[in-house]
């Protein structure tokens, strides 16, 4: 870690949201500094458990409502922000959406959203760690659907 920077630990939760085999993605454009397609996720608020955070963030960022099917795992990464090096852990959940409805949260710099076929979503995603979670989630979805357990 470069001198002068402090380490800040953060925890976020998010969802791979699926409806009728298609995956929800959001397009973020943060002041033209970075942009790309991402999965919905966000920070844990006081008093929330990880499942509550994942469902709230999906609803806030995309307008989509759904239910958690299962925990997918976590990923960790670091980035620099102002005077800190941020170490972020993201817990991911497989979520079944109620419909194809989505409305990007403009206040958080999301400018588009939609449901995409797996291969489209995989290639659209900006971050490699999110592509890995998407692959795991879609494999579980296919297994659950084949076994008649996808709801």
Where are the regions that the model predicts?
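Unchanged
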Residues: 44-132
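A generic structural signal for ordered secondary structure
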Residues: 14, 19-23, 50-51, 71, ...
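Charged phosphate-binding loop/patch that engages nucleotide di/tri-phosphates or the phosphate backbone
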Residues: 123-151
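Charged, low-complexity, helix/coiled-coil-prone segments
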Residues: 1-6, 36-38, 70-71, 75-84, ...
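N-terminal strand-loop-strand
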Residues: 2-39
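Sequence/structural signature of beta-propeller domains
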Residues: 20, 91-94, 150
